[in-house]
A protein has these predicted regions:
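Metal-dependent phosphoesterases centered on the DNase I-like endonuclease/exonuclease/phosphatase
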Residues: 52-55, 128-215, 219
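Active-site beta-strand/loop signature of hydrolases that rely on acidic residues for catalysis
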Residues: 7-8, 24-42, 105, 134-156, ...
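Active-site-proximal beta-strand elements of phosphoester/diester hydrolases
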Residues: 2-10, 102-114, 147
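Surface-exposed cleft-lining segments at the edges of enzyme active sites
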Residues: 85-86, 111-127, 163-167
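Conserved beta strand-loop-helix elements of the APE1-like EEP
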Residues: 64-79, 198, 210-230
């Protein structure tokens, strides 16, 4: 069995100061996929995670204090691929892949469109490019686990107020349609597949006391390619972890 956790930490150094290593020692995943690390490699507190038995692979944005993804793993990967080979995205440190035998694990941070029209347009182009890239990758690496912050809620069950949020980035009709297309192209939302009726969230705004009121969004996913579906054992949201405005999601596979 393998346990994988995905977690948008909203600044890794801040999360470490809020007890992330102690929490990680308790949860003890085989692989931890991080998003929004917001640091450069020379700022990475590697010894903290090394002490817990993790090897670290980081892919940082060029801009300091922004974006960035990482994979921490107790198992030695056969290969690590940094980026997608597309400069506009790779400059922002959004995609890293580690291969373990015939299984590939990705940590991905999809763009947010909340800052305005320009970034929303960037996000929509990224979504098409991401799907094309993943589908091409799947020809050589069919067993994919695509973990990360997708910055999209798919269905009304995934968001606390679907009516009022229907005009907000993250729940726009065109974003939801993209996710429907992505899933129908041969990818599986592990949490929704294993927990069809659970209304749980992975992100809450820091404003309006949203987390205490559980006014949240489910935007963090462990997607898997169709060949991995039979291996799905358990998927669950760890909403007691409070190192970030997101909480982690765990996937256990056979």
């Amino acid at each position: 069995m393998m346990k994988i956790i995905t977690y948008n930490v909203n600044g890794l150094r801040a999360a470490v100061s809020k007890g992330l290593p102690e929490w990680l020692a308790q949860e003890n995943p085989d692989i931890l996929c991080l998003q929004e690390t917001k640091l450069q490699p020379d700022q990475y507190p590697g010894e903290v995670f090394e002490a817990l038995g993790y090897k670290s692979y980081l892919y940082s944005a060029q801009k300091k204090g922004y974006s960035g993804v990482a994979i921490l793993t107790k198992r030695e990967p056969d290969h690590v691929e940094y980026g997608m080979g597309m400069e506009a995205y790779d400059n922002e440190g959004r995609f890293i892949r580690a291969d373990f035998g015939d299984l590939s694990v990705v940590s991905v941070y999809h763009p947010s469109g909340t800052s305005g029209d320009e970034r929303q347009a960037f996000k929509m182009v990224w979504l098409e490019d991401y799907q094309k890239y993943v589908m091409e990758l799947q020809k050589s690496r069919p067993n994919l686990i695509l973990c990360g912050d997708y910055n999209i809620c798919h269905e009304p069950i995934d968001i606390h107020d679907p009516v009022r949020n229907a005009t907000n980035s993250g729940f726009l009709p065109e974003e939801r349609e993209w996710m429907t297309r992505f899933l129908s192209a041969g990818y599986v939302d592990s949490f929704r597949t294993l927990c069809p009726e659970k209304q749980e969230y992975t992100w809450w705004s820091y404003r309006f006391n949203s987390r205490a009121k559980n006014k949240g969004w489910r935007i963090d996913y462990c997607m898997v390619s169709e060949p991995v579906r039979p291996l799905l054992k358990r998927a669950y949201i760890l909403n007691e972890a409070v190192h970030s405005d997101h909480c982690p999601m765990a996937l256990e596979i056979l």
